[in-house]
Amino acid sequence: TKMKLNLRFLKLMLLLFILPLQMLAAELGEAGKLLAALPGVSDVETLKSTHFPEKYVFFIKQQLDAKDASKGSFEQRVILCHRGFDRPTVLVTEGYNAKYALREGYIEELSKLFDTNIITVEYRYFDKSMPSPCNWDYLTVENSLYDLHHVNQTLHAMYKGKWIATGISKGGQTTMFYRAYFPNDVDISVPYVAPLNKGVEDGRHEKFLQEEVSTKENRQKVLNFQLLLFRRKAALLPMFEKYCSEKQYRFNAPIAEIFDYSVFEYAFAFWQWGEDIRKIPTNDATDDQ
């Protein structure tokens, strides 16, 4: 009869709905199942890892305005590398997107040293953590710190050991600000290369690069190389353009300006990354070198 057909159809639809959920649950390990059951957590997906027995990417619901829930919410992307429930946890505080943490071989320095879990939190308004519609009024440091606090409070249900916050560059700044706003959230804070800027134009960097970093002799070697690049610009620019084309780099300015900018920025980049001063080409080097 019509009623029996409706019941059969309903059972079929329920079966089609439940089976994918069962298949998903079967793919999740112990940590993944606990993660998926946490409030506000959604779209838990298994990732491959060469360093961790379980790894997942998921989303967590965050308020746009940390102090006013009526303003709406968005989904923030988080990557979890699970080592063990009895292990410490490293909370990586980003300043930009976090897609690098999706890589199969991803591991963080402090996690290597202390054999920890890793929770990498993508910064709001970047990549997959972009609110829709996009209202830039809510892209504030304070709101980003409440994002971290919410992730911390939610995942503390799984990881009750020591917590370490860490980040690099703008992520390192986030680590410092997070400690200032929520001093009891983590046990240790380890910012890497994190500037504490006095303003948009700070003024201290130029003096440091010109007068203080390394030795006078080494600073002169860097400057001499920059001047050499400008003297040979006519010969080097076609090579530079070819290199950028092969790497599929795209710029919003003429390639000659990009060349100049790269030369001007060389001193900052050189001292930032700590290259071997002996490898810098001198006046007798060929254009290819």
Language model features by range: what are they?
Residues 167-177:
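Glycine-rich nucleophile elbow surrounding the catalytic serine of serine-hydrolase chemistry
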Residues 138-156:
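Alpha/beta-hydrolase active-site loop
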Residues 159-169:
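Alpha/beta-hydrolase fold nucleophile elbow
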Residues 25-116:
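Catalytic-loop region of hydrolases
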Residues 97, 124-127, 196:
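Alpha/beta-hydrolase active-site loop signature
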Residues 177-289:
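Alpha/beta-hydrolase
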Residues 111-128:
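Conserved alpha/beta-hydrolase
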Residues 1-29, 210-221:
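Bacterial Sec-dependent N-terminal signal peptides
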